Regions:
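C-terminal glycine/acidic-rich active-site capping loop/insertion
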Residues: 61-82, 88, 93, 105, ...
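Structural motif
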Residues: 51, 97-98, 121-123
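A general structural signal for well-ordered alpha-helical segments in protein cores
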Residues: 40-41, 169-170, 196
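Glycine-rich phosphate/pyrophosphate-binding beta-alpha loops
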Residues: 97, 102-110
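C-terminal hydrophobic helical "lid"/dimerization subdomain
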Residues: 189-203
Length: 218
């Protein structure tokens, strides 16, 4: 796709339903960013490297919610939800690329994610980082505006595109044997959480916030 000019990662959930089922989502750290957005931010950092600064709008649309699960003993009862349910963020990466990261927990099930990279020569539509498998679609650029670009589904070029939850420990073992840093390493995980902390801080200050930590792009 040539030089990358921007990216977007957006996803939705239904926290009325999910927080009715999973009580831990009501606890500190169970908000839409910390519980769900980490998958998308980790994918962004894996592709583009560390985040330099962020500016965001974060809110909780419904601090009081009603249990919507008929089988639950709390069905129809009100419960407190004190975490963030929405976050809309501009990410400035250390490599100079800027993109958007948006998560909305006040929507519906099933989750519908958009993860797109825009380049000067084409566009990549990536799979949902919260799921396994899916198609990576390449949309080539056209020079004649009367022509319609023809999307192409790309071959992954490697195995383990489906449910492969043991892949991380397996790659870690290879990294230890080869004397290198594993891809899903602690520094990257810390940087992603640090980025979310600054997203929360930016929503309070109304300004760009630098992300103090950094990491290597895997």
């Amino acid at each position: 796709i040539g030089e990358v000019t921007s990216f977007e990662a957006c996803a939705n959930r239904d926290l009325d339903l999910l927080a009715s089922i999973f009580r831990f989502l009501r606890m500190p750290g169970g908000g839409i960013c910390y519980d769900f957005g980490v998958y998308y931010l980790t994918a962004i950092v894996s592709l583009f490297g560390p985040v330099d600064s962020v500016v965001s709008s974060v809110r909780n649309l419904a601090p009081k919610r009603v249990n919507v699960v008929p089988d639950s003993p709390e069905y129809g009862q009100e419960f407190d939800y004190s975490n963030e349910s929405q976050a809309f963020t501009i990410l400035e990466m250390k490599n100079g690329v800027t993109g958007t990261f948006c998560v909305n927990g006040d929507s519906t099930i099933n989750d519908q994610a958009v993860f797109t990279i825009y380049g000067k020569k084409g566009i990549l539509k990536l799979v949902d980082p919260n799921n396994f498998g899916g198609d990576i679609v390449y949309i080539p650029g056209v020079k004649d505006w009367t022509q319609q670009a023809v999307p192409e589904v790309l071959d992954y070029g490697f195995a383990y595109s489906e449910n492969s939850r043991g892949l991380g420990p397996s790659e870690m073992a290879e990294a230890i044997a080869e004397g290198r840093l594993n891809r899903a390493n602690a520094k990257m995980a810390y940087h992603v959480l640090d980025t979310i902390d600054q997203i929360m801080k930016s929503a309070e200050t109304g300004a760009f916030e630098k992300v103090p930590s950094t990491c290597e792009r895997p």
